[in-house]
Every structure is written in structure tokens, then in C-alpha cells.
Amino acid sequence: MLYTQAKAYLVGKLKEAGLKTKPYTTMKSLSRSMESHVGAVLPGTEMIARNGSKTIYQDQEGAQHKRRKLFDRNVTFQVVLGEYTDDKVEAMLEKFLAALDQGIEVDGNFVPLAAESVEWSTEEDHPLKAEVAVTVNITFRGGVYRDIGLHRARDYRLEDIGKNNGKEPANGN
């Protein structure tokens, strides 16, 4: 769900930043675009690494659970903004960056996000009709988790504790 929710989040933030057209989500449709005022959320890379960290937490009913993080997932998207002038692209970029939150919630887990790099290009450097374009790499740092319920032992009785002076019992004695 991380990929889907992160993509939808970025599309929404592009609209908040002042994009008037529907954001593109594939490079093929973006390169075919004849618009000069353009925005896109394109898939980037995903890094996966094994992680074995554990934490114990209580749910809303008070039951304790152990959550194990099986994998780290770093999903990167490329957000493209294009416009006629540098000033308009920069204004849209600043609105977009200002609209970004610290992270998003995915399946009850907080997933932080970071804007990692920005690349500017002119019409000679990209296939868009826009005069100036900027590409921002946004990375979401999430994970794959497994929850296990913790059960407390109840109704147990200690029958007998025997001391054998350091000798091993023979035949249960």
C-alpha cells in the first residue's frame, strides 16, 4: 500500500501547488503532452533491505502486540513541474515543497518523506513543451511489518520447588 498511497499523496500535493491540469503518471503520456503548464508524478526506484527490529506496543483495546519490521522500503518518486518561465516554475516548486508534510500514515504506520534532490532543465534538455522544467526526487521511508499478539500466562500454579544440592535427579527423584 505504500506505493499507491504515496503516489496519490503526491498527486494531491501537486494540485494544491497550483497545477491546473491532471498530473501525468507515466513518462510515455508525459512525453506525448502538448501542454506547457505540466506536472507529473513518475515512478522512480525502490530500495529494499532486510531489517529485524522489534517493538512492543498496545492497541486501542489495551492488548499488547509485538511488531517486527521485516524489511525497510525506500520508495522514490520523480515529481516533474513544467512551465513557460523560471519564475513560474520556481513559484510552483516552492508551493509544492511548502505543502509537503513530514510524512504520511500507511496501514497505521507513520512513513516519513524527504525531498532529496532537485534538477532544473531547459527545453533543450527535456522532451516537454514547457520552456523550463524541474524534477524533484521524493523518497518515502517505510517498511514491511508483521504483528504478533503477546499473550500473558494466566492461571498457573507452582506445585513444588526442590533443591537437590547440585546433584542431578535420577528417575525424577
Listing of model-derived features with the role each one plays in the protein:
Residues 90-149:
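Acidic-leaning, charged glycine-interspersed low-complexity segments
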Residues 15, 130-173:
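C-terminal tail/extension regions appended to the core domain(s) of diverse proteins
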Residues 1-60, 162-173:
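Small/polar-rich, solvent-exposed N-terminal microdomains that initiate assembly or binding
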Residues 67-87, 128-142:
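Oligomerization/assembly interface segments of phage tail-like spikes and tubes
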Residues 24-25, 62-64, 116-122:
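Short structured motifs
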Residues 41-44, 116, 121, 159:
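A structural detector for beta-sheet-dominated domains
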Residues 3, 7, 86-89, 93:
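Generic alpha-helical secondary structure
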Residues 56-65, 79:
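A broadly used, surface-exposed interaction patch
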